[in-house]
Amino acid sequence: MDFDFLTIAIGFLFTITLYQALNFFSRKSKNLPPGPSPLPLIGNLHLLGDQPHKSLAKLAKKHGPIMGLQLGQVTTIVVTSSGMAKEVLQKQDLAFSSRSIPNAIHAHDQYKYSVIWLPVASRWRGLRKALNSNMFSGNRLDANQHLRSRKVQELIAYCRKSSQTGDAIDVGRAAFRTSLNLLSNTMFSKDLTDPYSDSAKEFKDLVWNVMVEAGKPNLVDYFPLLDKVDPQGIRKRMTIHFGKILELFGGLIDERLQQKKAKGVNDDVLDVLLTTSEESPEEIDRTHIQRMCLDLFVAGTDTTSSTLEWAMSEMLKNPEKMKAAQAELAQVIGKGKAVEEADLARLPYLRCAIKETLRIHPPVPLLIPRRTEQEVEVCGYTVPKNSQVLVNVWAISRDDAIWKDPLSFKPERFLESELEMRGKDFELIPFGAGRRICPGLPLAVRMVPVMLGSLLNSFDWKLEGGIAPKDLDMEEKFGITLQKAHPLRAVATPL
């Protein structure tokens, strides 16, 4: 028995050694980017942990700014420097423009209709054009400015009501609700969630549940052979959530089509898109409008709310920075007033605070994964066909070769800096870069500073339960966005 066990153990060790040796020489012969040696079957999955952005940043310090890993069955290339990011996202943008599609997005075939996941081709270009011109163009954003102003006023009113009772405010949830209503007013001319009632709680929870499911690590993404099994049930649950949201949007679209027959015009984004679909059905149709709404509500709400929550957390963690922002606001627009978008040009410290928040806490720390359709050469290394490509913007924005004292929250570092977040300066690309840059960037750079500035100029803030600023937990939770592991709860006192 002992001899048999020893034989099996030796055979097992020999097999592992042989596998790793063959893998090592295979990697050398293909000239793949350097990386850790993979284990049989699981590859390098065991190295990711529950915060992959941090694990990958640590591995990159050993293996370099372009790194190759085997995550289950999926060859993965990780980029961890501004120079390599520029190579992938700008110089060879087209070669890296396809998406690596999570299995959860197969629910209701969303990947076949979504501008986020479609390949760069005529359909994608048409939808992207429709989105940019009808929602995120300067003229459209200017025309909708009054809607954003009204939603910020409602957020301030909600915080003021909570302050009267001394109740702590869940900042992320309040911002999430504001973002939802902003989008629903822009799209449909109506609120879909009410801060004071449970009448629309189901919709808010549906969007929240989609983000929770999308943020879970899914075995099928690493082992596509498990596709039919869906072992964690993520795609099944996502199918239910998507179905309910699509049914709601379908009802709103049908309702609007009936109104249009009666000559009713709202002049909102839905009206414009429906008119476009009637005039150019080959460019966009009803299904694409429905799926575009799904994209906007899922992607647009969480990134905005998580960024605002991180910004408020950094202000509460660093009271001297909050005082500096409040002093600027009081001097420029007057204490107690809500910030308007027209004020932002005169509020450089506030704008820098948002930049610094996005540097330290990029909403999507690894960006949305890319995929290579063909074999590509990058800086002498071979990136195989069908590789998943991750750009670790979290690591780039904390690189001490670029940033002095990178872990400290210092908005003033940007006061004399020319760096922008619009995809040209690869030291700071929280919204990505190239043709796949986040289309919602023009809205985000208006909405987030207005929300933050209004909260800071309307209230003094302190942490719930008398927690000292230095004791505020800033731990991260990795998911579809980089959220606070523990929601920020703060008490507001009107100024």
From Swiss-Prot:
Top-level taxon of origin: Eukaryota
InterPro entries: Cyt_P450, Cyt_P450_CS, Cyt_P450_E_grp-I, Cyt_P450_sf
Keywords: Endoplasmic reticulum, Heme, Iron, Membrane, Metal-binding, Monooxygenase, NADP, Oxidoreductase, Transmembrane, Transmembrane helix
Catalytic activity as recorded in UniProt: (2E)-geraniol + reduced [NADPH--hemoprotein reductase] + O2 = (6E)-8-hydroxygeraniol + oxidized [NADPH--hemoprotein reductase] + H2O + H(+)
Residues that coordinate or bind heme: C438
Entries under Gene3D superfamilies matching the protein: Cytochrome P450
Membrane topology qualifier: Single-pass membrane protein
Induction comment from the UniProt entry of this chain: Up-regulated by methyl jasmonate treatment.
EC number(s) stated in the UniProt entry for this protein: 1.14.14.83
Cofactor(s) the protein requires to work: heme
Annotated tissue distribution: Expressed in leaves, stems and roots.
GO cellular component terms, semicolon-separated: endoplasmic reticulum membrane
Alphabetized SUPFAM superfamilies for the sequence: Cytochrome P450 (SSF48264)
Family statement drawn from the similarity comment of this UniProt entry: Belongs to the cytochrome P450 family.
Biological role stated in the UniProt entry: Hydroxylase involved in the biosynthesis of hydroxygeraniol, a precursor of the iridoid monoterpenoid swertiamarin.
UniProt-recorded name of the protein: Geraniol 8-hydroxylase
Name of the encoding gene: CYP76B10
